[in-house]
Amino acid sequence: MTLRFGKIRRRVILAVTAALLTGGGAATTIWDRGGADASPVPTQPAEVVAEVNALLSRTPVLANIAPAGGYERECGIDKKTKKKQACSFGRAWNDPDDHSGCDTRNRVLAKQLSSVTFKQGTRNCKVTSGWVIDPYSGKRVELAQIGMDHIVPLRRAYDSGANNWDLLTRQRFANDPNNLLAVSRSLNSSKSDSGPAQWTPPDPTLRCGYSLRYLRVIDAYRLPISVADQRAIQRVCGISGQQALGQQPQAQNGGAR
């Protein structure tokens, strides 16, 4: 028992220290009872919790996000059916509002990576090297291992209501730099089309930050979240029942906006 108490005490100290280093806002350590070995949710700065709560208070909450028919990311010809694919969000990395001649992916890489170099003759467009501190694992990742993540996945957005948008709005969403992060390719793959209830960063100290980014995009495009997403966000941000300001769930699903 003494050893277990010592481990728990060290976890609390580390969580509080991390909060002071990342913002210093006053907050209380909340214990996550979801696992067999209960551990504290890392303390979040008060201003982060306040913004998460403010966003939750005006975000529509649905009982679930149901699949919407007609989604296809690819824009070519289906090899099996020989039919033209739906190209639901337009051609990849083709921003309809950008006329620089450089694709969205390379522009985001150039902005988010450190020690960036470019291929000669591309007018500082095609990134050939660089690294980033992965916002999901906290580890340094080199360009060869980097993937470009849509914080709110395209399929998730489509099922949540983007299926009712016009193509231009969907193209803008797919190329919005506020919804794009250079991350570990393997983590990007494991996340896939998941929302906050199905996937969170492996580093517990980065989970609330991910949730905040997710909510900012959801809010900007007036999309809903599910009840499970709402609860997951509250949990990883250490928001107790008394603090929670999220909307009450609505009956309809995400495919019927």
What are these regions, as identified by a protein language model?
Residues 1-18:
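N-terminal export and membrane-targeting signals
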Residues 23-43:
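C-terminal region of N-terminal signal peptides and the immediate post-cleavage residues
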Residues 36-41, 88-96, 195-201, 217-221:
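Charged, low-complexity surface segments at secondary-structure and domain boundaries
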